[in-house]
Amino acid sequence: MKIVWYGHACFLIKTKGVSILIDPYPDVDEDRMEKVDYILITHEHMDHYGKTPLIAKLNDAEVIGPKTVYLMAISDGLTKVREIEAGQEIQLGDVTVKAFYTEHPTSQYPLGYLIIGDKRVAHLGDTYYSPSFKNLRGQVDILLVPIGGRSTASEREAVDIVDIIRPRIAVPMHYGTYGGGSAEGFKRELQRRRVWVLVKDLKPYEGFEV
């Protein structure tokens, strides 16, 4: 499995012959992206949906997201669009995607995604801490967790989320663009709280394989 962070909450996940892009924000550089088959959107806010129409058309990719995203994509002239709800499970080739509710009060239908391929990756979109995340414990190898603290988890709340889910690897996101937070601050808070996890501190357009 290959995971690339394109900045903000935007990631590319390549596994089992499938390329999945998540939350392409307005400033992401589509010219630096690999080919994508599917675009998963966690919710309707423009810092997560931004370049979806352009990238979908360039790649002939299917867009998948909650009801508001479905309606936005249709209104933008996209035809390969699928709606997904919390609790629903779909197959993208040999990859399983499970949608779950996240705690983002300013969104109508906020979702996170558990992507099951060679490894299990959870993308939390925009979220605060939620006790319901305990349901993910034991299911997540790599956690993509927001730390920026602007309408989403702060560094401290992100540690609470890591502590309740207990992944093997945590990748901080949703910082350095809109809002505060830093990977170093997140790592310091993990150490201070004695929450042990391997942190992948990526630079935009940098990736790793697991």
UniProtKB/Swiss-Prot annotation:
Gene3D superfamilies in UniProt: Ribonuclease Z/Hydroxyacylglutathione hydrolase-like
The keyword Hydrolase is assigned to this record: yes
Family annotation (Pfam families): Lactamase_B_3
The keyword Kinase belongs to this UniProt entry's keyword annotation: no
An example molecular function term from Gene Ontology annotations: hydrolase activity
InterPro entries per the UniProt record, alphabetical: Metallo-B-lactamas, RibonucZ/Hydroxyglut_hydro, UPF0173_UPF0282_UlaG_hydrolase
Disulfide linkage: none
Keywords: Hydrolase
Family the UniProt entry places it in: Belongs to the UPF0173 family.
Protein name: UPF0173 protein PYRAB01190
Species in which this protein is naturally found: Pyrococcus abyssi (strain GE5 / Orsay)
